[in-house]
Amino acid sequence: MAFLKAEAMVVDGKQVFVRADGRFSIDGESFPIEKTLQRNLADNANNIPIVNFLLTSFPLARDHYLIKLQQFVNGMLWFRSLGFNEFIGLETGGTALEEYIIKNKLIDDFRRFLYNVSGQEFEFATPGTGEKMLLCIIGKRRVPFMGIWSSGTQALELLYFWMQRMGRATFVFIDEFDAFYHFKLAFEVCKILFNKDCQVFTSSHNTYLMTNDLLRPDCNFILNENKIKPLVDCTDKELRFGHNIEKMFRGNAFKV
């Protein structure tokens, strides 16, 4: 079982609270707490996060920074598709992707998405009453979509599902997002994701994506041996829009 060893919050350079090594202090003007309770929070035997305690114990204005923090955290999402689908955040339970597409009358939109991003054309059958699985028409046969898709198309279905949810997201991290994509498809997916109205992080081994056509160098990060640094902090060279960032990377111009 995990335990919080230390917590601290600083807002605009002002310390709100700090709890560490059995000690606790808080901005008493913003959050007046009696001494006995402060001692209990210092010990915190039941492992209650201080932020959660403040959110549930004090009436706060709608624009209070703790409310904004809570809204941001509640809008965070992590997902990936590496053989099977996984996610954390934004939703409380699993959803059958194809049932969702059918129920929300998104079949034609999903078909257009697949064509626009990957060039693939599918003819989906009109679902019958109670059908929860997408069926493709091949010749005169109705074939389950999942029976003919590639791993990349399967990953695109998951991406499409979460894109319908990203209007409520604040921060999205897609782990190994292009594990089953070819280079051009990964590039097209990035163009869509990076135009969303939320913060999006993707992880990849594809250096083809290290280009100013997608992101500025300060928005590209290198992860190596538990360290993460933006490209601009990995070199003394001046980085300009016309530079071939991938070529520089392959030439060992960046050091973490």
Feature-to-residue mapping (PLM):
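A short, sequence-level motif marking secondary-structure junctions
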Residues: 21-25, 146-152, 233-238
